[in-house]
């Protein structure tokens, strides 16, 4: 869509990254970390035009002198002032648009508290004067992006994971399962097991280094026990990583032990079922007649599904749980890191969607609760 004048904005607010851009585009124009940084020591950088807060990549690059905070935890906004800073940064610095001129589509985690989406609605209309807005469920958008309207989405980002069965475009709320285990927990776990190897990572700045190690070197083993034996008996699985200061560290079985926690949350001291079981449990909560369609359309989405080997392992684990004759298909689109955003871009540019927007006028008449009537 070349006509940015009236194009809707699509903002996928993740716990870890904000993905933002224009409806009709095939990828987000701005992707930056959902972080707000504040100087650790007031006045250290006298005369450097020091600001009281930094957002996104700028906070990331100055992380050595800042305390970094994520305003979203587990997919839910915990600090609205910081969240507002992130939205302000998105509109004015990243997309360079006037928010009062564009309808905006926001995304939210399934099973989000009602107050959360009301507050989002209120901020968009009252702080940013949006002409119209809509709040869509992330997993549903991922399914649209894969070209389906029925299937089960396993969506795992930085802060929260969900299994969301969707039938003919509607999420089935009674069968949605939520798992507070996602990318950030895996990063923390990798920090912990690297410490056991004698490397110390403790600060918020060092956590970002470990996140990079995770994204570049970790993978999911098809058979965990087998892989552990291979790692113990040879150095074939070892990889080296150069830290920003030039020190080189070696990482071995940590490469697959880290994401294994998705399948065995006990590694993190959590009592919940692994992602394969959660998926299966979610399917079993659905009507028996639609299960076949869900098994055959299991869609992975979100950054924490980007580990190499995760789709094959998921296939293997779900096959072991499902009835023996069931056809199981795991769909892992290569662009799944952004599939929520892509689905939003598709939805907001459909002509049939245009009547779905909540307008400023409707908001003024009904208040924030309008969001529950119009977005479901």
UniProtKB/Swiss-Prot annotation:
Keywords: Acetylation, ATP-binding, Cytoplasm, Cytoskeleton, Hydrolase, Nucleotide-binding. Pfam families: Actin. The modification N-acetylaspartate is found at residue 3. One of its GO terms (molecular function) is ATP binding. Residues 1-2 form a propeptide. Signal peptide: none annotated. GO terms for cellular component: cytoplasm; cytoskeleton. It is an enzyme of class 3 (hydrolase). Its main location: cytoplasm. SMART domains: ACTIN. The keyword Cytoplasm applies. Its EC number is 3.6.4.-. It catalyses: ATP + H2O = ADP + phosphate + H(+). InterPro entries: Actin, Actin/actin-like_CS, Actin_CS, ATPase_NBD. It is found in: Cytoplasm; Cytoplasm, Cytoskeleton. Actins are highly conserved proteins that are involved in various types of cell motility and are ubiquitously expressed in all eukaryotic cells. Belongs to the actin family. This is Actin, cytoskeletal 1A. It comes from Strongylocentrotus purpuratus. The gene is CYIA.
């Amino acid at each position: 869509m070349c006509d940015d004048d009236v194009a809707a904005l699509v903002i996928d607010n993740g716990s870890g990254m904000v993905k933002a851009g224009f409806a009709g585009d095939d990828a987000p124009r701005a992707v930056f970390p959902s972080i707000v940084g504040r100087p650790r020591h007031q006045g250290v950088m006298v005369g450097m035009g020091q600001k009281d807060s930094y957002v996104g990549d700028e906070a990331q690059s100055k992380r050595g002198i800042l305390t970094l905070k994520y305003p979203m935890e587990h997919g839910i906004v915990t600090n609205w002032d910081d969240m507002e800073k992130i939205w302000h940064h998105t509109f004015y610095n990243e997309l360079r648009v006037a928010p009062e001129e564009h309808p905006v589509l926001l995304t939210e985690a399934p099973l989000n508290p009602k107050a959360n989406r009301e507050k989002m609605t209120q901020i968009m209309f009252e702080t940013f004067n949006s002409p119209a807005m809509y709040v869509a469920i992330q997993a549903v958008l991922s399914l649209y992006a894969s070209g389906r309207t029925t299937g089960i989405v396993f969506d795992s980002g930085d802060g929260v994971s969900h299994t969301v069965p969707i039938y003919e475009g509607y999420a089935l709320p009674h069968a949605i399962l939520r798992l507070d285990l996602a990318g950030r927990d895996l990063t923390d776990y990798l920090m912990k097991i690297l410490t056991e190897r004698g490397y110390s990572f403790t600060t918020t700045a060092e956590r970002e280094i470990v996140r990079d190690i995770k994204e570049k070197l970790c993978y999911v083993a098809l058979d965990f026990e087998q892989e552990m034996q291979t790692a113990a008996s040879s150095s074939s699985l070892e990889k080296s990583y150069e830290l920003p200061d030039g020190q080189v560290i070696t990482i071995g079985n940590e490469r697959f032990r880290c994401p294994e926690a998705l399948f065995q949350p006990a590694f993190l001291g959590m009592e919940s079922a692994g992602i394969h079981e959660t998926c299966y449990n979610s399917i079993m909560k659905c009507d028996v007649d639609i299960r076949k369609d869900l098994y055959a359309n299991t869609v992975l989405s979100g950054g924490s599904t980007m580990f190499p080997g995760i789709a094959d392992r998921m296939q293997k684990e779900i096959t072991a749980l499902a009835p023996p004759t069931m056809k199981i298909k795991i769909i892992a689109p290569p662009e799944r890191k952004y599939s929520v955003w892509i689905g939003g871009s598709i939805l907001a540019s459909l002509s049939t969607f245009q009547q779905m927007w909540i307008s400023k006028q409707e908001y003024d008449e009904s208040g924030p609760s309008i969001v529950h009537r119009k977005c479901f």
